[in-house]
Amino acid sequence: MSADCSVGANPLAQLNKRVQQDRTLQHGSHVNIHQGAEAQAFKSGPQVSESNKFQMEQFMAGKASSGGNMFMGAGMSSGPLALGGSSGLRMSPGPAKELGARLGGAPMTGSWSQEFNQQVGSPVQSSSAVSSVSMSSASSSVARAGAYRPMNMMRPVMGLQGARAVGVERHAGPAINDAAWEQQFQELEKQVEKTLNISDPVEQQQVLEELSAEAREADYAGGDYEKRFQQIWNDIHDQTDDLDSRTELGGGSGDYQRVFSTRPAQTAQYAFETDNQYLHNTDAYKIGCILMENGAKLSEAALAFEAAVQQDPGHVDAWLRLGLVQTQNEKELSGINALEQCLKADPHNLMALMTVAISYINEGYDVSAFTMLGRWLETKYPAFVEEPLDRVDRYNLSRLIIEQYLRVANALPEVDPDVQLGLGILFYANEDFDKTIDCFRAALAVRPDDECMWNRLGASLANSNRSEEAIQAYHRAIQLKPTFVRARYNLAVSSMNIGCYREAAEHLLTALSMHEVEGVAMAPGSGNVPSSNILETLKRAFIAMDRRDLLERVVPNMDLQQFRGEFNF
């Protein structure tokens, strides 16, 4: 398997994903399921608690509480990110050992699969566990700027427990007399007026007008304001169209349409490299396989597979390998497009289903990821799937699929690393990183030389603020596959987490050098353009090094030779 975890920080893309969430009831696919603590705690439906009703009543009356805070998930931060709150969330014996014990007749007492079932039946407990997120400030601006996502995501985490506590406390406390409230407000108003000396309404208006004029001048002082705003707006609009095209998938077999969406639509088109030396080579697919086996650059292997699918658009294996290569090459969207084309031709391709599920998690399309994971299990172990996924509402989808994976894991005579992978992805999406780590380690016990699994383990460790352990996992992945661009990129981010900015820059420059293919120009809009994630992270590394002179050199298609005199890569 080769879908991998990665780190990216594209603010426009993140804003677009927030816009995408508002349309979940329309498409039911390619949306982020993490819309609040309730969703993460597997609540069975859009239920409203009494405290939330009370807060809504306060809001409608103009007395909304500000107790609820929303934080951007910052796995790159040096501060603790505690998603559990109790050690009970850990799988203490480990999945492999636990599975063996269960198969030998041992009860499930103390296992996290039993804990999961208990949490599903206890909304209050689950909500509390999720809402116990704590986050300290990062040690540098770089740490705050970059952030891990569930496998590639900066997901907003709703701290709703604080809001609930405030709401309950106010509801339970003695009612405040209206007259007393008005008196306190007037006293506070007088104190502010006295302190700021703005009691004169005419003077207040003059101050506001002056501030407004200064603000307008400041807005326009930086250059062509309208042009820059229009450019940003156009980028947001274009990315929204791109997500819509991916949401409205279809046009293939009935199974394919059922997995993606009930609406007839078209799969997003893959952007091919125009300068391709293998385009007229009839053995392009074989050449691509040889390049991968011999450790060639992933970008070069991608060119061979691109040529193969252009020669034969129905070549399932070529589309599959192209998707695998691009996800490893830190080109997620190109990988998703290729994998979707593979599934359009073969909806039951197990490797494509699992790989695209991880890529969907990376891009924030959790509902589609859960659907793909359910489809994978339904295809490989149909006897364990009791309820068709098309009859399950999206709020119960994650819980149901986790239960199905646990049922399979408990019943198998030996550990299936792919089942552990799927289970780990599900926990990863719900930010249960301790369980994710145990699942990935159980898979590595069976497949110790799986470089992609080592990379996924590293991403999970990094999200648990265990950067040193993550770095070891990434090094193991790179040792197994030196051309693994995504692992190098993740290694750079973890290096930045511990303050090793120079080393991070060298890892990023190495990754960029692997995107270069001899004799191939990197044309804008082609699939061979270096990852913007790598370029942006390199800029942050140079900023952390206080090297503004180097920052100015970081542009698309830059000549990497200018950095070789100072950096080893």
UniProtKB/Swiss-Prot annotation:
The record's section on PROSITE patterns has: TPR, TPR_REGION
Q: Which residues lie within the region annotated Amphipathic helix 2 (AH2)?
A: 53-71
Keyword line: Cytoplasm, Isopeptide bond, Peroxisome, Protein transport, Repeat, Thioester bond, TPR repeat, Translocation, Transport, Ubl conjugation
- Region listing for Amphipathic helix 1 (AH1), in residue ranges: 6-28
Q: Where is this cross-link: Glycyl cysteine thioester (Cys-Gly) (interchain with G-Cter in ubiquitin)?
A: C5
Task: Write out the ranges of the annotated region (Amphipathic helix 3 (AH3)).
Answer: 150-154
Q: Where is this motif: WxxxF/Y motif 1?
A: 112-116
What protein family is recorded?
Answer: Belongs to the peroxisomal targeting signal receptor family.
Q: What does this protein do?
A: Receptor that mediates peroxisomal import of proteins containing a C-terminal PTS1-type tripeptide peroxisomal targeting signal (SKL-type). Binds to cargo proteins containing a PTS1 peroxisomal targeting signal in the cytosol, and translocates them into the peroxisome matrix by passing through the PEX13-PEX14 docking complex along with cargo proteins. PEX5 receptor is then retrotranslocated into the cytosol, leading to release of bound cargo in the peroxisome matrix, and reset for a subsequent peroxisome import cycle.
**Free-text comment about domains:** The TPR repeats mediate interaction with proteins containing a C-terminal PTS1-type tripeptide peroxisomal targeting signal (SKL-type). The WxxxF/Y motifs mediate interaction with PEX14, promoting association with the PEX13-PEX14 docking complex.
Protein name according to UniProt: Peroxisomal targeting signal receptor
Species assigned in the record:
Eremothecium gossypii (strain ATCC 10895 / CBS 109.51 / FGSC 9923 / NRRL Y-1056)
